[in-house]
Amino acid sequence: MIVGPVKVRSACSHHLCPILGRVWIGLLPNEFSNLIGLSKYARICDWIMSRPQIQEEAVTMLADELQTRVKPDGLAIVMEADHFCMHWRGVKDDESMMTNSVMRGAFLKDANLRREFLSLLSKKNGG
């Protein structure tokens, strides 16, 4: 199952500039997983992203929270975000995006499952 893209907003903890992005969540539940409602994924993303932080930490915190709550056999998270510190400071580059991923369980161990998840994201984004 894939949930996303979920729009997220945060602030860079280094510069306190906005971070605007999207998150995709892949889950491979099992018979013992605690499935949550679809809107809860967006709420958890919003809760995690509501504090200043760096993107790498946010993705890991989101993975930890979902792993604890849902207990799936596999968990995959991809986050793509625009960092306004890149627009407003230093290089003033308004085209670069940062992408991070976390793969756990079956998504980490099974290359075919991981490839399927990433290819479905690519198709959703016109790739």
Residue ranges and their predicted role:
Residues 1-127:
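A domain-level signal for the structural core that forms small-molecule/cofactor-binding pockets
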